[in-house]
Each structure stands twice: as structure tokens, then as C-alpha cells.
Amino acid sequence: MLTGGVDISPDYYHEKNTGKSRSICPLLDKSEKLLIEHAMKKDIPILGICRGMQALNVFCGGSLIQDIPSEIGAAEIHSSENENAVFHNIQISKSSPLSKIMGFGSHRVNSYHHQAVKKLASGFSIAASATDGIVEAIFCPSKKFVLGIQWHPERDIDAVPENTKIISAFIKICTDNERRTI
């Protein structure tokens, strides 16, 4: 599981820091890159949450919008200046594994991010998008379970029961996978 956190250095997706990528941690970037490369090679299940989804995309060859408000001016608000959640709707793709977990269609999710997928990594597909087109979930169809979600399911377990299903699906696939040599 790759969790939320600080921004990823734009160096990893061959862009200059526009000044909007902030609080970068080179050690975290390097360690998550190595973890993702190993897990993808060995087909070890991955659940990327918020920064974790962005790391999946970047370290598999994609890129990021460094700051949604200044680069896109999106219709949806995806973050606030404090730790209070912003909520918006996403549309889950029928063909994605996320639709099997949460159900196809529209779902309300929390949002704490100011960055988002710009160029999708090769081999990945979009699992969900916000109404403004911002990518909210990605997956790798050629792997057993590689799913990235932009929201934090752990923060709204009680309010949004579907969030429990995401964590449960990841635990189940990891349990089924535990006998494999890592």
C-alpha cells in the first residue's frame, strides 16, 4: 500500500518545478520508485492512495499536473488550504476493477489533492474521473491488482461504506497472494 504524502519531484516526469510542486522528499520518491518497480515486476498487489496513485503513474512512465487550480482551473475543487476535506463526485468506469468493488456509476469521495494525472502511464487505464475530467482512479489491466485512487478511503470509512470495500478487496488479494515468494 502506497499512502498519501508530499508531492513527487517533477524531475521524475521530465518537467521543471513550476514552484507549485511543494514539500518534495527525495528519499520517499526514490524508495517508492524502487518498491513500485519491484511490485510490478513480481505482480505483487498494489493499492495507491492519493500520492500513492500519483507515484504509480509517475514511476510507471506517466506525468502529473503540478497544480490543478493554476494549470487547469477545474470546475471541481480538489483541495482546501487546511486539512478539511473537500467532496465531489466521481464516475467509475464499468470496465474497471473498481466498479466490481464499489459499483458502477457515480460516487461521492473526499479530495485532498492539488496534483493529478496529466499523461497516463503506458499499460494503465482510467478507472474513474471527476466531473471536470480529472483522473481519480487508475489500474493496470495486465496485473492481478494494481489500483490507484486519488481519495482517502481510510478517512471516511463510516460515512462512505464503499470505502471499506476498497480496503477489504486489497486485504483479500494480499491474503490470497501471501504464499508467493516476494
What are these language model-derived features?
Residues L2, I24-I44, P69-I182:
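Amide-donor transfer/coupling interface in amidating biosynthetic enzymes
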Residues G5-I8:
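Short glycine-rich anion-binding loops that position phosphate/pyrophosphate groups of nucleotides
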Residues P10-Y13, L56-F59, I138:
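Short glycine-/acidic-enriched loop or helix-start segments at secondary-structure transitions
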Residues Y12-Y13, R22, M40, C60:
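Ubiquitous "structural anchor" signal
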Residues Y13-D29:
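Glycine/small-residue-rich loop that forms an oxyanion/phosphate-binding "nest" at active or ligand-binding sites
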Residues K16-K20, I65, K165-I167:
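Glycine-rich, phosphate-binding/catalytic loops in enzymes
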Residues E37-S63:
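Catalytic nucleophile loop
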Residues G62-I65, E178:
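Conserved active-site segments centered on acidic
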